[in-house]
């Protein structure tokens, strides 16, 4: 591949910066926020926070009723999948327009897709009956990079989620690596190397949590989050993309990060942000250990704002590092 070709392709993709990535308008959630989907999620991730399903308990909390797990934000507007041909589309739910940013990269041979970063912001927790829309705009595309997975581009977009009243309920900045798959790759780190450790701070350490990652854990999380990308359930497809096996999707990873922190902080905790960087894949046969430490704390009126540095690692390296910011009513603050 020549430099001229690379630059020309990047210029084509860059022309989309600041523009909606879909010409058909915002994505509309197929369903309103509902208990069955919440139940599927919490069962798949074994998240027993009572504010997600126990209406009587939730009514006594700051939320006043059942709310959806915050890490489900992206799940609600995931498109209904067209299963036929999904592998050829790299896991995309439907046909990707040829002149779209991802369509241009696919046509250029960069058909591999790997999520690398996610920053979630929550303006409020979602309630039963909320019907979401999401508008997604391209933010940036990197120069062509060489990684263990092959040549490719880091592509970043921002999705803004609104409710029926057009009020913003959350945002996500999402980065993926679009690459030319190589058949000779034996990937152990997802092409990103070891993610940087969270800067340690003085404060309480969260008790470690060990997740025995199995194929069932990987597939259950993908289905509960409505992610039908073959790399999360089809081993042959995953290894063809350079992964050692099927691997956990980023929605599931965010879900486990949310569970880990709220298991410690309690059901009155409200997450404001989940910001993570992915490194080594979470794959069957490797126990994933979550650890955390309080790295910041301040008061805002009657609430404590707490920042927790988190890390989840297996024998392949750091799967995810990042921070979670949450609030707690002062009387309920974990300490």
Annotated model-derived regions:
Residues 92, 152, 156-157, 230-232, ...:
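Short, intrinsically disordered/low-complexity patches at protein termini
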Residues 2-117, 183-268, 333-335:
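Hot-dog-fold acyl-thioester-processing enzymes
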Residues 88-89, 93, 127, 275, ...:
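Short flexible/disordered coil segments
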Residues 245, 252-297:
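Catalytic-pocket segment enriched in acidic/His residues
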Residues 1-26, 115-209, 282-335:
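HotDog/MaoC-like acyl-thioester-processing domains
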